[in-house]
Amino acid sequence: LRCFKELGYGNILGVDPADVIAAEATKNGIPTISTHMNEETAKNILKEHGKASVVTANNVYAHVDDLAGMTDAIKTVLAVDGLFVFEVSYLLDVVEKMLIGTIFHEHLCYHSVRAMSRFLKSQDMELIHVERGPEQGGAIVGYVQFKGGPRDIQESVAMLLKLEKERKLDKPHKIRGMYEGLES
């Protein structure tokens, strides 16, 4: 969150369930509360800080067992024209590069653009841009707004949906192929 402070954002708040990380961030000038992001936390943030123009979740969605609940909490604090930005390991890279370490790293979920797009639509939100990156062996950064928000959906979303279809990421044999590759 330091980058937002450096860009001049004034009302910055971190949320992290790890006490040590929250304390260290606060000590370094980024006020951070030590708790999970859920509806109760969101209501407290809203009451004390108001709506957020930007909400980020870097490598958080992979560890959450209630994705809809966390997304509801994010929606509670996000301004109607706000932007939600998340980073997750990219399922296509996990499968094609056989990133078994990613799987053993306590991740509960692995994300494709197709699945995230569908999930977000069910939450009255829309994926408007996606970037691929090298983090964790392969990651995506998704940019999200409320459905019908002020930003256009970028070509990057359609391009990665097309890539996933071409690579047959939606077919069970693709995942089985990873399993078979690990067995050999």
Model-predicted segments: where are they?
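A short glycine-rich, Lys/Arg-flanked "PGG" loop and its adjoining helix->strand segment in the class I
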Residues: 68-85
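A conserved beta-strand element that flanks and buttresses the S-adenosyl-L-methionine
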Residues: 53-56
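Conserved SAM-binding motif I beta-strand of class I
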Residues: 10-16, 34
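Conserved SAM-binding loop of SAM-dependent methyltransferases across substrates and taxa
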Residues: 1-9
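Conserved SAM/SAH-binding beta-strand->alpha-helix loop
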Residues: 18-20
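Flexible, glycine-/basic-rich loop-and-beta segments that form/coincide
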Residues: 136-183
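Short, glycine-/aromatic-enriched active-site segment of Class I SAM-dependent methyltransferases
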Residues: 84-109, 113-120
